[in-house]
Regions:
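Membrane-embedded alpha-helical bundles of multi-pass transporters/translocases
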Residues: 1-221
Length: 221
């Protein structure tokens, strides 16, 4: 989104940028809604895919299915927040876009403290997505990028955006296939294996989150 939006801003001005962003958001929201709804509807099948080792432990499996259903709409809110970040970065407003992801920990920790239940963690993840969208809204309103979404798959600039997204989607797809296989394997290893893997992954991702994402966002055109 950022390169195409920046190009429109540079070549045609702010109004053209706003018009493109409204269409990009409209198309993206359609995709995000479809993915989120399918995830909720097929949560049981997805849980069997990536946590098949829990099937024989009925209470744990049912809790995992419930948590999957609760968390899947996070994709919608996270995608919406990512679009907001793109607009803010393109308009050189980096502070809010950089701060919003920090709410991830706030949502999870806050929910866990307020509600002592495993489901609280899933609710916290969902709350994080909502908070990220809300946190960006004032900044987006200040720059005038709160126009209602427009669905237009035929717009040439939207098509350019989708063409740019496809290679990245393929690359991320490889990563997530590996993640699903790892989760499936870990579900067979007994209590705590999933948590150990998550903590190790977060430790590995820490430098990327602090340095790589910040630098890459600032160097985008």
């Amino acid at each position: 989104v950022v390169p195409v939006l920046s190009k429109r801003l540079a070549e045609e001005g702010d109004e053209a940028g706003k018009s493109f962003f409204a269409r990009a958001r409209g198309v993206s929201l359609v995709v995000l809604v479809i993915v989120s709804v399918l995830g909720v509807l097929f949560a049981r099948q997805l849980t069997e895919l990536w946590a098949g080792g829990y099937v024989d432990d009925v209470p744990k499996f049912e809790m995992t299915v419930t948590m999957t259903r609760v968390m899947f709409p996070y994709i919608f809110f996270m995608g919406t927040a990512a679009l907001g970040m793109a607009a803010l970065n393109a308009k050189k407003h980096f502070a809010v876009a950089a701060f919003a992801p920090a709410l991830f920990s706030v949502g999870i920790v806050g929910a866990a403290i307020a509600w002592r239940d495993p489901l609280a963690l899933a609710v916290g993840v969902l709350a994080d997505g909502v908070m990220q969208v809300i946190a960006q809204f004032p900044a987006l309103k200040r720059i005038g990028y709160t126009e209602l979404p427009k669905i237009d798959f035929k717009d040439p600039h939207v098509r350019e955006m989708l063409k740019r997204i496809l290679p990245m989607t393929f690359g991320l797809g490889v990563y997530y296939v590996d993640l699903v296989l790892s989760r499936r394997f870990l579900s067979e290893l007994g209590e705590g294996a999933q948590s150990w893997f998550s903590w190790a992954s977060r430790l590995c991702d820490l430098p990327q989150g602090i340095f790589v994402m910040a630098i890459s966002s600032a160097t985008l055109p």
